[in-house]
Amino acid sequence: MELEVFAGQEKSELSMIEVARAILEERGRDKEMYFSDLVNAIQVYLEKSDADIREALPFFYSDLNTDGSFIPLGENKWGLRSWYGIDEIDEEIVTLEEDEDGAPKHKRKRVNAFMDGDEDAIDYSDDDPEDESFNTAEEDTEYDEEDPDDEKSEVESYDSEINEIIPDEDLDENVDLDEEDDDYSDDEEDEEGE
């Protein structure tokens, strides 16, 4: 493969991006190339080894994306931006996508949960099983009067728990409580609280 643009130049001095531009210009419009085919054509022209191409590939791909003269056309196809007018660029990309897909894409149907009479609408009113008990007719709840026997059993259970901690034998039944403590008065309490 010979490129007229580079006639008389050393191939070792050429960059991959220059060669890519020349290859695409020679092919002409509507002859976009897949990235892999473009890299293979560059490798053949520059007579570089696979190892050299693999090493330069990330830099070449970055240059291809940042150089303003190339345009990605979808599915890793590349062309020259000069082939397309500004208004034509979006149309060309859309056309390629439609041609490749074959069938137009279907839009998903949006569901409005508040629509009445729509069979597909989601009814959120019956989602929570806890709400089922509230949907039934409210029954009058009758509260029993306090049963004195219940109170006695509660007191006995508290007493038994206290006895487990402090047995009855250890309790001093003759504790005298002096309601008036000579060492402490209400006036001192007020002063400390302030």
From Swiss-Prot:
Region (Disordered): 117-194
Entry-linked InterPro entries: Asxl_HARE-HTH, RNAP_delta_N_dom_sf, RpoE
GO BP: DNA-templated transcription; regulation of DNA-templated transcription
Keyword Nucleotide-binding appears in the UniProt entry: no
An MF annotation (GO) of this entry: DNA-directed RNA polymerase activity
Keywords: DNA-directed RNA polymerase, Nucleotidyltransferase, Transcription, Transferase
HTH HARE-type domain segment(s): 14-83
GO cellular component: DNA-directed RNA polymerase complex
Function: Participates in both the initiation and recycling phases of transcription. In the presence of the delta subunit, RNAP displays an increased specificity of transcription, a decreased affinity for nucleic acids, and an increased efficiency of RNA synthesis because of enhanced recycling.
Binding partners and assembly: RNAP is composed of a core of 2 alpha, a beta and a beta' subunits. The core is associated with a delta subunit and one of several sigma factors.
Similarity comment: Belongs to the RpoE family.
HAMAP family assigned: RNApol_bact_RpoE
Listed name of the protein: Probable DNA-directed RNA polymerase subunit delta
Organism per entry: Streptococcus mutans serotype c (strain ATCC 700610 / UA159)
Originating gene: rpoE
